[in-house]
């Protein structure tokens, strides 16, 4: 009975172990929740137009480039203490009485320091042509007095690409001196003809510099107007041995009247880039739609047509091209990111109530196709109408993804009207999605230096356009899974692309079997610049330094681990097991000691009894 009476107290020793194992086995319940963290990130400074991301001071923390009062650029540097983004660097363009229209950080002179390209509309503009100026980086900051105003103007915001494969960003666009595309080569800042084409460039364009031919070398994608019919079309200029030549021309979907900005994503998780196109079938966007054309195909497949919710019809906000804009014009844009880390990229869009004036940001989740119209694409978008903190932001103008806490989980940034006449309010929403899915975060640097960088600072923040990343792994069910992404493929019209790629892996904790990285190559070079790494740990950040450019086997990669919830749960379970084992050892030791004492007393008693 005494032994039976001790049984409950012995079982109590199992509780840490059982609790830990229960948590580990069940895991967190997936949840789609957003939490507004604007105050802790910005304090009272949450206003302006977020125009770009980049690591200005090379501290491996992404900084924010914000436009204010039409002609000021403020750089919010990431900080370890709240508020976590502080306005530290300011460049003013007030003396030029200009409206700044875009900001593109990059290393335009090859010194491994981040510079910043601004495009602007002069106050006295008559032809609506954009001026451009480069502020040069120095000592991990910007010198407002050290700048170069480009000697040509642009018809539209330029595309930042690596035209000659030297990993110094170049500036591509139609200038005031020719109706043919020109390229301003980074480094020596010399102008050259880029391409010979009869097509006109569409305004606003959504050109891209990304691999579309599955050879790990970035191609040039152009949004153009047919020279004879003036219809919208899309041209792929393939990079063949470092030279661009037109390989594919694709017409827009026949019934699309309002054409938005092209976006690129590995929509179906096959390792190849797909082309997404939002738009409307009527001028007022009463009937909105998103089409997709798969890699290597020419057939447009609708992946979202249902924009109605509880009797309310929503639609895209058409682009308004004003001759004298007072604010930055914003075209129909999909901002791509894997919100739930399932390996299938999702999107953020701005939609307007077609029967009212309400305008909000919505999350589009990438889900398996459930109807005949999207069968060819295998997947489709589903609108998440009910995301509380996102729904509370009225008059939203821009919504994009951003890894606020550098933990591999993509959070959301929304710009909305209403702060002042000329400035937006900035809202930041933490992503509390807790399915404990895995990811790999990859950033490819310029590789212009390795261990011999100026002031021994590795240039983490040079915003390199053109690298292409692809992985292969095995999912939780044992099937082969691929994923791919291009780094900084688009730069115009508030593309707001991140200087890194977060690739979701789903709930499989398997190592990545292969991770490939390719970079652009110069004219005449036939060998592809591509390197492979194997057995990459999930939930890690990989920083690739392609140095020297033409010897991929010598490229280096730095790996940084980001522990996930499962690591914490495993630690709890392990501690529980250790406590349990120590308790058992302690009890057994105590019982053995008691038995020894009892035996000694019996021996002593027997000795005295025998003596008598």
UniProtKB/Swiss-Prot annotation:
Belongs to the TIP family. GO terms for cellular component: extracellular exosome; plasma membrane. It is a single-pass type I membrane protein. FG-GAP repeats lie at residues 258-293. Glycans are attached at residues 36, 95, 139, 146, 151, 176, 188, 226, 243, 353, 371, 482. Residues 1-33 form the signal peptide. Pfam families: C2_ITFG1, FG-GAP_3. InterPro entries: FG-GAP, Integrin_alpha_N, Tip. PANTHER family: T-CELL IMMUNOMODULATORY PROTEIN, T-CELL IMMUNOMODULATORY PROTEIN HOMOLOG. The chain crosses the membrane at residues 567-587. It comes from the Eukaryota. Keywords: Glycoprotein, Membrane, Secreted, Signal, Transmembrane, Transmembrane helix. Ubiquitously expressed. Interacts with RUVBL1, RUVBL2 and alpha-tubulin. This is T-cell immunomodulatory protein. It is found in: Secreted; Membrane. Modulator of T-cell function. Has a protective effect in graft versus host disease model. It comes from Homo sapiens (Human).
């Amino acid at each position: 009975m005494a032994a039976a009476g001790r049984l409950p107290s012995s079982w109590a020793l199992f509780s840490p172990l059982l609790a830990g194992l229960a948590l580990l086995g069940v895991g967190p319940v997936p949840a789609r929740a957003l939490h507004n963290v604007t105050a802790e990130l910005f304090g009272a400074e949450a206003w302006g137009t977020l125009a770009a991301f980049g690591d200005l001071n090379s501290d491996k923390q992404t900084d924010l480039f914000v436009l204010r009062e039409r002609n000021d650029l403020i750089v919010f540097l990431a900080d370890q203490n709240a508020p976590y983004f502080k306005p530290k660097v300011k460049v003013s363009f007030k003396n030029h009485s200009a409206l700044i229209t875009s900001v593109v950080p990059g290393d335009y002179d090859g010194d491994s320091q981040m510079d910043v390209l601004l495009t602007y509309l002069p106050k006295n503009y008559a032809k609506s042509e954009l001026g451009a100026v480069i502020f040069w980086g120095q000592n991990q900051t910007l010198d407002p007095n050290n700048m170069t105003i480009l000697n040509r103007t642009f018809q539209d915001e330029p595309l930042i690409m690596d035209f000659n494969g030297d990993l110094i960003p170049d500036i591509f666009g139609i200038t005031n001196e020719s109706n043919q595309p020109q390229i301003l080569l980074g480094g020596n800042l010399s102008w050259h003809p880029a391409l010979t084409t009869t097509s006109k460039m569409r305004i606003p364009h959504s050109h891209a510099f990304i691999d579309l031919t599955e050879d790990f070398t970035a191609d040039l994608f152009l949004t153009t107007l047919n020279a004879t019919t003036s219809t919208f079309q899309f041209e792929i200029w393939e990079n063949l041995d470092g030279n661009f030549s037109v390989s594919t021309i694709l017409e827009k979907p026949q019934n699309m009247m309002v054409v938005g900005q092209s976006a690129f994503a590995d929509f179906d998780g096959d390792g190849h880039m797909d082309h997404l196109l939002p738009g409307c079938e009527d001028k007022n966007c009463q009937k909105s739609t998103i089409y997709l054309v798969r890699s290597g195909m020419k057939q447009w497949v609708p992946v979202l047509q249902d924009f109605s919710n509880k009797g309310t019809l929503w639609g895209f906000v058409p682009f308004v091209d004003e001759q004298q804009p007072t604010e930055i014009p914003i075209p129909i844009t999909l901002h791509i990111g894997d919100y739930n880390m399932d390996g299938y990229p999702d999107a953020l869009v701005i939609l307007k109530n077609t029967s009212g004036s309400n305008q909000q940001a919505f999350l589009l989740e990438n889900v398996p196709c459930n109807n005949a119209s999207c069968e060819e694409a295998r997947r489709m978008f589903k609108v998440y109408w009910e995301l509380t903190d996102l729904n509370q932001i009225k008059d939203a103008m821009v919504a994009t993804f951003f890894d606020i806490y550098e933990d591999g989980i993509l959070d959301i940034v929304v710009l909305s009207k209403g702060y002042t006449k000329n400035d937006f309010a900035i809202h930041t929403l933490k992503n509390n999605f807790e399915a404990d899915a895995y990811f790999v975060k990859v950033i490819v640097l310029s590789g212009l230096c390795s261990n011999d960088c100026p002031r021994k600072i590795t240039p983490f923040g040079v915003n390199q356009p053109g690298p292409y990343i692809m992985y292969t792994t095995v999912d939780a069910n044992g099937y082969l899974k691929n994923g791919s992404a291009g780094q900084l493929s688009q730069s115009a019209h508030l593309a707001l692309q991140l200087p890194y790629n977060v690739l979701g892996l789903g709930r499989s904790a398997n190592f990545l079997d292969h991770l490939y990285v390719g970079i652009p190559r110069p004219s005449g070079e036939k060998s592809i610049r591509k390197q492979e790494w194997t057995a990459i740990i999930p939930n890690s950040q990989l920083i690739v330094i392609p140095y020297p450019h033409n010897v991929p086997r010598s490229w280096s990669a730095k790996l940084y681990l980001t522990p996930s919830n499962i690591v914490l749960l495993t630690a709890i379970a392990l501690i529980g097991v250790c406590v349990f084992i120590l308790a058992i050892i302690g009890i057994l030791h105590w019982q053995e000691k008691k038995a020894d004492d009892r035996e000694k007393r019996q021996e002593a008693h027997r000795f005295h009894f025998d003596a008598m």
